Amino acid sequence: ADMTLKNHFRMDGSSYHVVDYDMRTGKVRSRCTAQGYSDESAWARGQAWGIYGYTMCYRYTRQLKYLEQAEAAYEFVCTHPNLPEDLIPYWDFDAVNIPHELIPSSAAAIKAAAFYEFTIYSKKPKYKETADKVMHSLSSSDYRSKIGENHNFLLMHSVGSYPHGNEIDVPLIYADYYFLEALKRKRDCDIEAKSKSVQK
């Protein structure tokens, strides 16, 4: 976690996909974004992994540096000028044909699950508000499958690796997983908020 914190992230809070290290010295040999538009671009699912991963690092270690990195990544993603109004990101924030690029539900589901986890550790309402908006979008007919359709997956329009032509605009099991995890975390947050309001 510390090595990734040191070498994967850019000053603006975004991250590379892959960092190649010298096996003998541990020094960085190269940085790239294999599944993104370019090495210096911000691949959407990679940004979601960064937010999710460092929120979970904080959960288990309580080291503030991890939460701060998750927050920096959140700010990059949620204030990016190329983020659509429904908060479902294009497959890469720097893809050349925006707004005519694929919009993967998979990246959004990971983000939502992370944002709900973040609400446990921050009093700022923006994290839950953002997560709720993402889930509202994912639950719409634009992304949510009808029962019995889409091979019985919950979400449509995920993207695996666009540059490699793999899993393009298809359902993906991990998108459904993080969607369900986000729903569970949303439910927990809502129950806790209701309990606090009753106690008042």
Put a short name on every predicted segment.
Residues 1-200:
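Glycan-recognition and catalytic cores of secretory/periplasmic carbohydrate-active enzymes
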